[in-house]
Structure formats: structure tokens, C-alpha cells
């Protein structure tokens, strides 16, 4: 399998990942949206509690299924794809939540591989905002960044930090590094 063409964009909440993914898609780059937001929307609509502020383990399990599916779907396209988070993010989420990473999640993070260089958006206080789906504080967002660095390195990835720059500059930065210029 050619997992080198699967590029992960990770980082804490509110660091500009979704905005960057949307801009990359508009520029013609194949992308895969963050699954966590979809799970949150569905749980809120259904009155479920598999939410990051309620049942974190259930939320992680739902994210895992979708992140594994996103990985397989991106592989099937044959295209260079930028994914808004990857399977290791599920392990990172549990660590930030103070929960152990169960073997099935650790195994999935080891099995679903991506390009060895992972892009990480640093915490950026000037652009951080909360919303109905992002209830984390700036402190938790900053801690999430640090945990994602640790988590991805633990799975053998090299991290490339995105510049704190306008979206167009971030698009150019990322496209130049994935060969999509």
C-alpha cells in the first residue's frame, strides 16, 4: 500500500486545521474532513452522549471507526490526500482526557500508516475560538498540541510545524511539501 501519499494534518483545536483543509480542497487538493466534528454533530442531534465532554471512550471508539474508514477511503482513491487528523489522534484524544489507550486503538494507530512526515498546527491564541462543537479552553487546546506531538512521535512520525501565517501562506507551505504545487 502506498501510504506515503496520505498526509495528516493534526494539532490542537482552534489552530486553523479545518480552515486550511477547506482552502486546500478549494485549491484542488484531495482532502478528508475531521471525523470528530461529524460525530459530535450526530450525537448532539440524536441526544447521544458519545461526546468529548461526556463519554470520552465512546466518542473515541466512534472516531476510531471513522478515522480507519477515512484512511482506507483515501488509500482507495489513489490520490495524494490531506486528512484532517489521523488514527493516532484518537490515542492522543484519550491521553489528553486522562484515559488509557486501549489495545484496539493502539493497534489501529500502528496499522493505519500515513506519510512519515505529519503536519501539525501549533496552538495559536490569536485565532483560537470556541463553538458548540469545540468546547475546549485555550489551555486544553495548547495541551492537546503537546500531546499530539508526543503521540505522533511515539508512533514513529516526524512532525512538521505549520507556520503561524495567513491561510494562503499555509496552503502554499503545505502544497510545496506534499508535491501538489
Tell me what each language-model feature is.
Residues 60-113, 128:
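Glycine-rich phosphate-binding loop used to anchor ATP phosphates in small-molecule kinases
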Residues 9:
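Hydrophobic anchor at the beta1->P-loop junction of P-loop NTPases
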Residues 20-21:
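Post-Walker A alpha-helix
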Residues 25-68:
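Conserved substrate/cofactor phosphate-moiety recognition/catalytic segment
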Residues 12, 24:
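P-loop (Walker A) phosphate-binding loop of NTP-binding proteins
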Residues 16:
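Conserved glycine(s) of the Walker
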Residues 98-165:
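A glycine- and Lys/Arg-enriched "phosphate-lid" helix/loop adjacent to the NTP-binding pocket
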Amino acid at each position: 500500500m502506498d501510504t506515503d501519499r496520505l498526509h495528516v494534518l493534526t494539532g490542537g483545536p482552534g489552530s486553523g486545521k479545518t480552515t486550511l483543509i477547506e482552502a486546500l480542497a478549494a485549491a484542488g487538493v484531495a482532502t478528508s474532513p475531521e471525523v470528530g466534528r461529524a460525530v459530535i454533530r450526530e450525537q448532539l442531534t440524536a441526544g447521544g452522549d458519545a461526546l468529548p465532554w461526556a463519554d470520552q471512550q465512546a466518542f473515541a471508539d466512534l472516531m476510531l471507526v471513522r478515522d480507519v474508514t477515512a484512511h482506507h477511503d483515501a488509500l482507495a482513491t489513489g490520490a495524494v490526500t490531506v486528512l484532517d487528523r489521523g488514527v493516532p489522534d484518537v490515542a492522543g484524544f484519550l491521553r489528553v482526557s486522562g484515559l488509557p489507550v486501549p489495545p484496539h486503538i493502539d493497534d489501529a494507530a500502528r496499522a493505519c500508516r500515513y506519510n512519515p512526515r505529519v503536519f501539525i498546527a501549533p496552538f495559536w491564541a490569536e485565532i483560537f475560538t470556541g463553538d458548540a462543537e469545540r468546547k475546549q479552553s485555550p489551555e486544553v487546546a495548547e495541551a492537546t498540541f503537546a500531546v499530539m506531538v508526543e503521540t505522533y512521535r511515539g508512533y514513529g512520525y516526524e512532525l512538521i510545524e505549520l507556520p503561524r501565517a495567513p491561510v494562503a501562506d499555509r496552503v502554499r507551505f503545505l502544497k510545496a511539501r506534499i508535491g501538489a504545487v
